[in-house]
């Protein structure tokens, strides 16, 4: 099977090798930089079209920062609303953690990269607190570091568009 997203991630050099500390705190010999790669419209639109076509949702949400451009692109491709989950509460203006209306909506959370699943779990918790109905997370790349299991314990299915093992093969 041809995976256009995988091909574009490779083309736009989404994998770098070296010594890295991941958001989870884990050490890694490689870094998957989807945030930079999706600045290319060809890749971003391919991801958006795939998610819009393949998944059933009423609202797409992303955790700041990596999930925001993805959520906006999917929103445009699917012609459905999007929401943004703040990484932290603001101390000015409105103090809401979520920008957008998710209450009573079937929400799909999108992530750029998952490893342990901590960011996704946080996003799911915030969405549920706001009254969203959520049972799935889509990630562009899953590093296969426990996110699937962590989310399953929360009743959430993880849907990777690409797995790290495919990207590194």
Curated annotation (Swiss-Prot):
Which Gene Ontology MF annotations are present? Answer: magnesium ion binding; orotate phosphoribosyltransferase activity
An example GO BP is: pyrimidine nucleobase biosynthetic process
> Which gene is this protein's source?
pyrE
Protein name (Swiss-Prot/TrEMBL) = Orotate phosphoribosyltransferase
Residues noted as binding orotate in the record, renumbered to the chain: 115, 143
Family, similarity comment: Belongs to the purine/pyrimidine phosphoribosyltransferase family. PyrE subfamily.
What general EC class does the enzyme of this chain belong to?
Answer: transferase
From what organism does this protein derive? Methanocorpusculum labreanum (strain ATCC 43576 / DSM 4855 / Z)
Record-listed E.C. numbers: 2.4.2.10
Task: Write out the function statement from the record.
Answer: Catalyzes the transfer of a ribosyl phosphate group from 5-phosphoribose 1-diphosphate to orotate, leading to the formation of orotidine monophosphate (OMP).
Keywords, comma-separated and alphabetical: Glycosyltransferase, Magnesium, Pyrimidine biosynthesis, Transferase
């Amino acid at each position: 099977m041809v995976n256009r997203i995988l091909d574009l991630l490779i083309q736009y050099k989404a994998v770098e090798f070296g010594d890295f500390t991941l958001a989870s705190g884990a050490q890694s010999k490689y870094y998957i930089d989807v945030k930079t790669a999706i600045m290319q419209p060809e890749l971003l639109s391919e991801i958006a079209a795939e998610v819009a076509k393949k998944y059933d949702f009423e609202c797409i949400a992303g955790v700041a920062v990596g999930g925001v451009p993805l959520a906006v692109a999917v929103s445009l491709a699917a012609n459905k609303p999007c929401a943004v989950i703040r990484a932290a509460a603001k101390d000015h203006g409105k103090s809401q953690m979520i920008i957008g209306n998710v209450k009573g909506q079937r929400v799909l959370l999108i992530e750029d990269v998952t490893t342990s699943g901590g960011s996704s779990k946080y996003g799911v918790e915030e969405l549920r607190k706001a009254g969203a109905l959520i049972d799935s997370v889509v990630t562009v790349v899953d590093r296969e570091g426990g996110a699937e299991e962590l989310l399953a314990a929360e009743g959430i299915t993880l849907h990777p568009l690409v797995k790290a093992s495919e990207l590194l093969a």
